[in-house]
């Protein structure tokens, strides 16, 4: 008998700190939950705001369910389940997602769960239910030895990209294996051990799946524009006959254990700055102490007056950023504090500063006003997480998985709002003060003297990558297996439902007397407002000998106002549960704000004060310079940053400011004075080149009333933005190489100067690119380099134009020992793309690009981007209908014309950042002559 729970969840968020007398809006999350006879929990949530549905399958299995010697299996299945199932066939959900206009088809693995999620047009709901059922009941037979061998390589590439080939990548591994005992489920990393993964047999993998991927260990959530009664019928049809698995025994709660404090150090090949991390074992997810621990970490590091920031940043000037978080999982939790210090800073000094900050907190505790502001921010964050059907679906799935109750949100919020100052001090005393901890010192190579005194060396077994050492496999082999029986023919894909009508938001426009253009969309899905003011110019109006001025100007405008110190400004925003920030880009400076609708006027008043009444604080200016230099030093150690910066110079030329880092260079930042920032502000921050965009639960009249004073208070000035001409594509291809000794991956950037956003060919070229490298798993680059060869974790191609011409770029990180082979395969794909493009490719592209319009404007962020496209490029409010016509009228001949014109492999820049010792000479075989080495390695990196 199916069990059924119907709940209308009503949550009232009452926060006493709110400065307005308005009643806090009442949040309603309506859901219905049923449990099938086989144990599958299914949760339904109705949201009619857009004709889309989020589908999420969450299995209650993560790395914590693995055993020593067989790690990485949970994460491996996150990959495998997208590849094939008996009835969807090869390509599985990825191919279907492209056909039906799905968005965000993805998965993730944690210590405790694995989820599979995406948003689709509402007419594809039955197809998705059919596909999700195939994952649980008709999948595992399709996993064969060649499939497993290939996916092992993909996962290895993911680890190289996220761990081995990045600064501080091994830090968490060292922490967790010392924080948790050897037999603890959190002793190893989610991605697992490469050795365990390589040793995994097909039988090991199938045994793991059959134990954990069962209905009684899973939750299915359908959230969005659904007919619940019809959806129930489909759920029963496709899921009922999947057999129930064996009973799952819950893991017992088991905190980490540190018998005595331990200090370890590691000389990191990629680090340029020393990093100190300190970790304490704490409480698990939803434990009564976890809420106060969240507040503790937020208070200690958030804002100018936070104890760690006051001492480590302002007083001692040892760093520009302190990060602290309470990380709670199902079995245990940990409090983690990280400080990336300035160049050549001894971490003993940092630790002394940390101890001083703890002493200050112990003496003063957390003031009520700070507790109130943190709760206000939590309220805004809660609403933000519910701004999409996928966000709501994930919350419902998580609550059900961990508590058995999708409505646990009620208790969750109540516990959050019930935290007192006393609770915060209690958890500090219980988990932090005088308690044993793990400390790691990650220092640059040959920088052992910067580590904590007495630290012992952490031993990391690093992978050796040798040419030709990887296991061979043939991904083209068709799997042969016995089909799993069913009561009906599951190979027949369900039909579409009624065609949904895309809801294009209504856009309003206005203009102030000072030239400020205003664009808005009213949307009352959640009681939030998001807005930004985009001021044209950005880096483009800098001088070449003062690179970084725009970035520093934007940063300094956040640091107080004429009548408010930094602390007072931060406090005023925080009490509203709002945010206001400035950022600089290549073509503009952007002011962004997010607030509860009831606090919009108060929030905007603060943002206007930041914009019109800068404080120009000299002390803050010097701190920001140090932060920029610190970030630049760290970029020097990041292969991805190195690759992108070097590639930009090859695309645009060294004399074009578009080729330069927005942060500037270490030399240029050192030369900048506060007068340079004031000059930039006086000359370029003008409403004559600005546009304001507003989205949310607010009317046009309220917005215009809120900014009418800007006509008088923000005077227009004439601003001339220099024109930098983008070079033409090269006449022939050249290979460029940037040496990163001992790199486990090579960063590839292949491309050429291309189109501006407003060029007539820009959008058609993007349509052409969908099947090449813009369509994720539907693209040929992904299918051949990742799925076919296992060379990479990810690869994409894109056109990136602004008001001036941009570039076409293929980007990827590939296993070091296949740098040449990956490049040759990309060259071959490009050479044959136009010629081999067929009706099936065209149908796939059209199907996705048209059907995906149903969810093009679902989120507030998407609506803001729509307004920015309209204001920045002069597009019509219904420009999506014009684009839809372009897609519908696209032909194979037009695709071939665009491919021949814009993605010619013989007229491109082929850039590689990797290990020159093993890969440079091999690149001659690509056929574009002798590679050009762009740098000489100054310091050999240890083996």
Tell me the role of every PLM-derived stretch:
Residues 1-6:
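Bacterial N-terminal signal peptides that target proteins for export
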Residues 7-14:
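Bacterial N-terminal signal peptides
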């Amino acid at each position: 008998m199916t069990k059924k729970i119907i709940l209308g969840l009503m949550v009232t968020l009452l926060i006493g700190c709110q400065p307005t007398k308005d009643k806090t809006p009442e949040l309603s999350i309506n859901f219905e939950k049923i449990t099938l006879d086989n144990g599958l929990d299914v949760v339904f949530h109705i949201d009619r705001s857009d004709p889309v549905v989020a589908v999420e399958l969450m299995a209650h299995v993560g790395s914590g369910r693995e055993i020593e010697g067989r790690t990485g299996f949970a994460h491996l299945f996150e990959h495998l389940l997208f590849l094939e199932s008996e009835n969807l066939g090869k390509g599985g959900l990825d191919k279907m997602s492209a056909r039906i206009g799905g968005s965000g088809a993805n998965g993730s693995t944690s210590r405790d769960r694995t989820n599979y999620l995406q948003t689709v047009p509402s007419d594809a709901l039955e197809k998705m239910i059919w596909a999700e059922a195939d994952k649980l009941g008709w999948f595992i037979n399709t996993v064969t030895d060649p499939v497993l061998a290939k996916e092992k390589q993909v996962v290895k590439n993911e680890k190289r990209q996220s761990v081995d080939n990045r600064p501080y990548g091994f830090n968490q591994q060292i922490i967790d294996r010392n924080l948790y005992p050897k037999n603890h489920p959190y002793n190893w990393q989610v991605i697992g051990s490469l050795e365990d993964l390589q040793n995994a047999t097909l039988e090991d993998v199938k045994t793991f799946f059959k134990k954990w991927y069962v209905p009684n260990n899973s939750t299915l959530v359908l959230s969005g524009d659904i007919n619940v009664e019809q959806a129930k019928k489909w759920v029963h049809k496709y899921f009922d006959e999947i057999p129930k698995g064996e009973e799952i025994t819950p893991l017992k709660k088991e905190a980490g254990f540190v018998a005595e404090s331990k200090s370890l150090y590691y000389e990191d090949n990629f680090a340029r700055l020393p990093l100190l991390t300190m970790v304490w074992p704490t409480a698990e997810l939803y434990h009564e102490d976890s809420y106060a621990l969240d507040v503790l970490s937020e208070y200690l590091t958030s804002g100018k007056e936070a104890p760690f920031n006051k001492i480590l940043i302002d007083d001692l000037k040892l760093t520009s950023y302190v990060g602290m978080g309470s990380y709670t999982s199902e079995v245990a939790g940990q409090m983690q504090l990280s400080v990336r210090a300035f160049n050549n800073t001894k971490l003993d000094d940092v630790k002394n500063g940390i101890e001083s900050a703890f002493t200050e907190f112990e003496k003063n505790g957390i003031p009520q006003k700070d507790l109130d502001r943190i709760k206000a921010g939590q309220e805004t964050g809660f609403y933000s997480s519910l701004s999409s059907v996928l966000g709501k679906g994930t919350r419902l799935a998580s609550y059900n998985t961990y508590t058995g109750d999708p409505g646990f949100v009620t208790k969750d919020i109540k516990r959050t709002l019930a935290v007192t100052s006393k609770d915060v001090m209690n958890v500090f005393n219980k988990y932090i003060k005088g308690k044993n901890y793990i400390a790691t010192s990650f220092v640059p190579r040959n920088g052992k003297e910067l580590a904590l005194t007495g630290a012992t060396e952490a031993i990391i077994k690093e992978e050796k990558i040798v040419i030709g050492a990887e296991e061979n496999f043939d991904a083209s082999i068709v799997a042969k297996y016995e089909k799993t029986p069913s009561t009906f023919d599951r190979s027949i894909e369900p039909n579409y439902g009624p065609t949904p009508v895309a809801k294009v938001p209504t856009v309003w426009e206005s203009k102030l007397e000072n030239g400020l253009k205003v664009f808005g969309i009213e949307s009352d899905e959640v009681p939030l407002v998001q807005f930004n003011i985009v001021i044209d110019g950005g880096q483009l109006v800098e001088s070449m000998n003062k690179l970084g001025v725009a970035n520093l100007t934007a940063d300094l405008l956040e640091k107080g106002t004429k009548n408010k110190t930094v602390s007072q400004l931060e406090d005023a925003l925080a009490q509203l549960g709002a945010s206001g920030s400035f950022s600089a880009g290549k073509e503009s400076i952007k002011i962004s704000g997010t607030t509860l609708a009831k606090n919009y006027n108060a929030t905007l008043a603060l943002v206007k004060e930041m914009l019109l009444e800068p404080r120009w604080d000299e002390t803050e200016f010097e701190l920001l310079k140090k932060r920029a230099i610190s970030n630049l030093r760290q970029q020097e150690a990041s292969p991805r940053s190195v690759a992108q910066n070097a590639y930009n110079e090859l695309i645009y030329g060294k004399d074009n400011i578009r080729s330069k880092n927005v942060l500037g260079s270490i030399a240029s930042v050192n030369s900048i004075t506060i007068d340079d920032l004031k000059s930039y502000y006086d000359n370029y921050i003008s409403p004559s080149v600005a546009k304001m965009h507003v989205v949310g639960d607010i009317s046009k009249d309220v917005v215009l009333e809120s900014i009418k004073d800007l006509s008088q208070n923000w005077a227009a000035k004439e601003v001339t933005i220099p024109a930098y001409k983008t070079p033409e594509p090269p006449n022939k291809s050249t290979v460029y190489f940037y040496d990163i000794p001992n790199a486990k991956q090579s960063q590839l950037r292949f491309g050429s100067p291309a189109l501006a956003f407003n060029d007539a060919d820009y959008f058609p070229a993007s349509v052409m690119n969908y099947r090449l490298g813009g369509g994720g798993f539907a693209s040929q680059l992904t299918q051949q380099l990742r799925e076919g060869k296992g060379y990479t974790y990810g690869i994409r191609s894109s056109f990136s134009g602004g008001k001036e011409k941009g570039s076409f770029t293929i980007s990827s990180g590939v296993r070091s020992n296949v740098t040449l082979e990956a490049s040759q395969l990309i060259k071959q794909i490009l050479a044959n793309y136009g010629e081999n493009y067929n009706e099936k490719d065209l149908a796939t592209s059209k199907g996705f690009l048209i059907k995906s319009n149903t969810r093009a404007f679902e989120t507030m962020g998407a609506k803001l981007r729509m307004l920015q496209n309209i204001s920045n490029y002069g597009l019509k409010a219904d420009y999506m209908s014009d684009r839809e016509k372009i897609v519908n009228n696209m032909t194979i001949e037009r695709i071939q014309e665009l491919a021949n014109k814009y993605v010619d492999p013989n007229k491109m820049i082929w850039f590689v950042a990797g290990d020159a010792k093993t890969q440079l000479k091999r690149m001659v075989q690509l056929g574009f002559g002798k590679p050009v080495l762009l740098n000489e390695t100054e310091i050999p990196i240890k083996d």
